[in-house]
Amino acid sequence: MVEPLLSGIVLGLITVSALGLFVAAFLQYRRGNQFEI
């Protein structure tokens, strides 16, 4: 009964971390473009 909960938590952490990395990279990319312009 614990495995579904654990797998759900792991999937949630992976999704959130991936989303966070994507947002950070996007913000850094935009900031770099603003500096160039």
From Swiss-Prot:
<keyword id="KW-0150">Chloroplast</keyword>
<dbReference type="GO" id="GO:0045158">
    <property type="term" value="F:electron transporter, transferring electrons within cytochrome b6/f complex of photosystem II activity"/>
</dbReference>
<dbReference type="InterPro" id="IPR036099">
    <property type="entry name" value="Cyt_6/f_cplx_su5_sf"/>
</dbReference>
<dbReference type="GO" id="GO:0015979">
    <property type="term" value="P:photosynthesis"/>
</dbReference>
<feature type="transmembrane region" description="Helical">
    <location>
        <begin position="5"/>
        <end position="25"/>
    </location>
</feature>
<protein>
    <recommendedName>
        <fullName>Cytochrome b6-f complex subunit 5</fullName>
    </recommendedName>
</protein>
<dbReference type="InterPro" id="IPR003683">
    <property type="entry name" value="Cyt_6/f_cplx_su5"/>
</dbReference>
<keyword id="KW-0793">Thylakoid</keyword>
<keyword id="KW-0934">Plastid</keyword>
<dbReference type="Pfam" id="PF02529">
    <property type="entry name" value="PetG"/>
</dbReference>
<keyword id="KW-0812">Transmembrane</keyword>
<dbReference type="GO" id="GO:0017004">
    <property type="term" value="P:cytochrome complex assembly"/>
</dbReference>
<comment type="subunit">
    <text>The 4 large subunits of the cytochrome b6-f complex are cytochrome b6, subunit IV (17 kDa polypeptide, PetD), cytochrome f and the Rieske protein, while the 4 small subunits are PetG, PetL, PetM and PetN. The complex functions as a dimer.</text>
</comment>
<keyword id="KW-0472">Membrane</keyword>
<keyword id="KW-0602">Photosynthesis</keyword>
<keyword id="KW-1133">Transmembrane helix</keyword>
<keyword id="KW-0249">Electron transport</keyword>
<comment type="similarity">
    <text>Belongs to the PetG family.</text>
</comment>
<dbReference type="GO" id="GO:0009535">
    <property type="term" value="C:chloroplast thylakoid membrane"/>
</dbReference>
<dbReference type="GO" id="GO:0009512">
    <property type="term" value="C:cytochrome b6f complex"/>
</dbReference>
<keyword id="KW-0813">Transport</keyword>
<comment type="function">
    <text>Component of the cytochrome b6-f complex, which mediates electron transfer between photosystem II (PSII) and photosystem I (PSI), cyclic electron flow around PSI, and state transitions. PetG is required for either the stability or assembly of the cytochrome b6-f complex.</text>
</comment>
